[in-house]
Structure formats: C-alpha cells, structure tokens
C-alpha cells in the first residue's frame, strides 16, 4: 500500500471520518491483509458485503440460503474435480485442491491466507455458510446458478466465482 494512501487514511481518521476495509475476503482471512496496512480500520465489510462489523460491536450478517448451500454441495459431489472455497464466519476451507487452485493461491503472495481442507457435507450442516467460491467456468457458473433461486455470482477473477445471497 503506498505511503500516500496510508497518509490519506490517517488524515481522514484525524478529521473524524471512519474508515472501513471492504473486501470479498471473510473475517477469518483478514489478518494477512490488515497486517500489510499500518492503519487501524474502524470496521470490516467482508464476504462481498455479507458480513459487516465495526469496533463498537455492531454486526450485520447475511448467510447463504441453507437449501441453496445443500444444492451446491450436491452439485460439487456430481463434479468431483471442482475445487471450492467455503467461507464461514470464523473458518474458511476447501473441499480439496488442484493445480488451478494452487496457482491462484500462490499468486496472492504474502496476502495468501493459510489453506485448510474439510468436508462441506459436515461443515455446512453445522455452520452458517456466507460464501462459496467454486473454481468453475462461466458456463458451469450459469448451470449452477440456474439451480439456486436465492444465490447470485460475483466474479472478479477468471478462475472462480463468489456465490453470495441474491438479495
């Protein structure tokens, strides 16, 4: 982050303006980013807006629809080669790994969070899921979204799509 940006953020705070970091990342993966920016943010808007928190304890969150999550997990079962990143409030994991995922993760450099693997059948049944990011093509995205009435896709990278609540 350029020093001019850091100076500008600090000047805003000195003038009473609250600053938030807004990202598609989940709170559980924010420390690797926040550790590279020497600014104390007043809050986080994470998971593409699905999880918002500030330093005073305010929290607003909106998880994926449980029926849509179950449909996505079944779809992943039918497409065993597809890797997906699955985000909960305090934990982010992959269903498995492949070369495409490893290349993408390596491109994050020092902002790449730790990678964990888990069973989405178990985790999604026991924990709210805020975002699922399968490594799929645009055609596969259209196929999957046609099955999900309460979910939309947000794509900022050619290798994967972030699936978030539609509303």
Task: Name these PLM-found stretches.
Residues 5-103:
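Active-site phosphate-binding/coordination module
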């Amino acid at each position: 982050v350029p020093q001019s940006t850091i100076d500008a953020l600090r000047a805003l705070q000195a003038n009473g303006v609250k600053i938030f970091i807004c990202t598609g990342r989940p709170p559980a993966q924010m420390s690797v980013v926040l550790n590279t920016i020497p600014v104390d943010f007043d809050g986080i808007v994470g998971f593409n807006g699905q999880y918002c928190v500030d330093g005073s304890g305010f929290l607003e969150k909106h998880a994926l629809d449980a029926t849509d999550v179950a449909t996505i997990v079944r779809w992943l079962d039918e497409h065993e080669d597809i890797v997906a990143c699955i985000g909960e409030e305090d934990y982010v994991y992959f269903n498995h790994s492949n070369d495409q995922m490893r290349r993408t993760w390596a491109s994050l450099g020092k902002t790449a969070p730790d990678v964990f693997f888990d069973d989405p059948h178990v985790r999604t049944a026991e924990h709210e899921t805020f975002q699922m990011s399968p490594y799929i093509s645009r055609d596969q995205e259209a196929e999957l979204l046609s099955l999900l009435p309460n979910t939309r896709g947000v794509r900022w990278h050619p290798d994967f799509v972030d699936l978030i609540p539609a509303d």
